[in-house]
Amino acid sequence: MTIIDGHHQLILPGLIEKHCHFDKSKLGVPWYPVTPAKSIVERVETEIPYLDSLELSLTERANHLIDLELPHGATAFRTHVDVEPMTDLRYFDEVQALAQTKPFAVEIVVFPQHGLLRSDSVELVDQALAKGADFIGGVDPYSLDGDYKKSLAETFRLADKHGVGVDIHLHDRHEAGTTTIKEIIRLTKEYGLQDKVFISHAFGLNDFIGEERDEVYDALAAEKIHINSSVPITPNTIPPIMELLRHGVNVHLGCDNIYDCWSPYGDGSLQEKLARLGELFNVKDQDALTQLLGLVTDGVTTLDEQGQANWPQVGAEATYLLTEAECAAAFVARQTPVEISVVKGTTLYQK
């Protein structure tokens, strides 16, 4: 048995990166800015040829991304991976092989970024799911595929066929966003996929008003549909996270774009995302900051909402981090550096 001397540091649960893209990283190659694109379609159609031309392999670039996140406490990852005719299964196979070499958990989302229907990717997605992916993804089925009901029906059919979860990028606003969200709720209930469906970004949650707003948020909670956010700072874009939490909706954070074809920014810090969220929503007091940690730990917090000890407990998995922070609230607000992270008893990172 290995004994780690904590030197009177604070122990916290390991952080979970809930939304990233291993295959899109440009980390490790010379600086190249984001080129202008007139639409999401233009962006996705120029991205793959560019990534294929880079001097570093997907595996090398993904490792740079992982190495960027580990010092900030990440101990598990969920990555979306492009699967469509331009990539075939190349990216998926490489990410899956990489994941199998890591001591930490890597969940893989099959991501038909060019549109499940628009790019005729149903068969390829089916093949990737058969090879062991954890989730089926998608993006804006209303605006990109042009038939959100058919697109979502295929998505949930494949999820049911392979016994996997769903994690869909949803940037659409107003009617496009709200109708898509309501259809996801309906299909989650129909297929019995409670606790296995995630909506990433979910900007359209801002567009529900009045009684319908409460009804939809309550339905998300009832069907145990999770929301993933990268905490955008564009006005009126980030979902109303604190309101969702009050309704009992599970919310998680992820870094998303980190120096790729979509954004030149991103430092790989889940701590920064958490602190930014706290500032945006004016979270200041001890109890609220303590609970905020749960957004990057799958809901695990050191204290429960009544202030009682909640973690660690005897028998809990030995996945944790050590920090000089005085308490969880200080770790969240002050972004106190991580000194050591451990996954299942094995040291993953040491400062």
Regions found by a protein language model. Name each.
Residues V44-E60, E107-D120, D140-D145:
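Active-site mouth loops of central-metabolism enzymes
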Residues V110-R118, A130-I238, Y259:
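Active-site core of metal-dependent hydrolases
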Residues I11, G28-H80, M86-T101, L124-A130:
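Alpha-helical scaffold segments that flank or form the walls of functional sites
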Residues P13-S25, V81, G165-H174:
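Histidine-centered catalytic micro-motifs
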Residues W311-K351:
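C-terminal cap of metal-dependent C-N hydrolases
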Residues S25-L58, T180-F198, V216, C255, ...:
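Active-site gating loops and adjacent loop-to-helix segments of metal-dependent hydrolytic enzymes
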Residues M1-L12:
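Histidine-rich, glycine-flanked metal-binding segment
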Residues E190-V197, M242-T323:
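His/Asp/Glu-enriched, well-ordered alpha-helical/loop segment
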